[in-house]
Amino acid sequence: MHQPFFICIILLSSVIGNCQFYYDDSALVSGSSKYLVNFYNKTRHDFNVLYNGPFHYSYPLIKQGSPYFSGEAWQKGSVTYEDIVYDTVLMKYDLVKDQLIVMIGEKGHMPLELFSPRIKEFSYKDLKFIYIPRSSPLSLKEGFYQQLSNGKITALCKTENTLEEIIVEDRLEWKITQKKRYFIVDNNHSRTINRQKDLMEAVKDHRQQIINHLKEQKLKFKKNKEQVIAAATALYNKLERQSNE
């Protein structure tokens, strides 16, 4: 009478736990449950290193915003995990937990949370994110940063989402608030970019050319800080390469 409940407990503890072992008690499992276990074991065998982490539980219904960088849709990209590059991986970047979520299988069978310190970088579409470890000489908070440009200087953006409870017509609801911070890294030194003055100081070697370029592109710091920082640092790196040729 209590056997189905017992089977569910066994499955849950083996499948959505820390995912460190195979489930192999086939005597207790049959039908669709056995298919799920077989699928999980096969996938763990094929992708043992990457697909290794706790189960990712979905968030409550959120009225405003999304906890993920690119919304709820799964993105297909690549991730460098323990110095091995994995391509065509289904992923989401959770900005609330600052964690990369990967999906086993195309049909959404099992979302897992990867151990962040083992990830060097991940990317999808034209977006790239790098992991800054605690041991880094940079005075930056440990975690993932979007790489806006890369070269002699590197522009980074740190996006943090917070899940907040709100009361709407006597009902409890949730919303996302977002905070972005920008940095430029030069020679293992990080500089916080809050104002256009900070940006111009970071690119002072080519200041006038960059100012002219931003004017031509009609880019204004106050209206689109991220685009201006990306454009300015990309041009700076291009001019640096040209001067060294």
Where in this protein do the model-derived segments appear?
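Bacterial Sec-dependent N-terminal signal peptides
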Residues: 1-26, 232, 244-245
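Intrinsic-disorder/low-complexity, polar/charged segments
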Residues: 28-30, 195, 221-225
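Exposed alpha-helical structural elements
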Residues: 35, 117, 198, 209-210
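Surface-exposed, beta-sheet-biased, low-hydrophobicity segments with strongly acidic/polar composition
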Residues: 50-52, 67, 71
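Long, compositionally biased interface segments
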Residues: 201-245
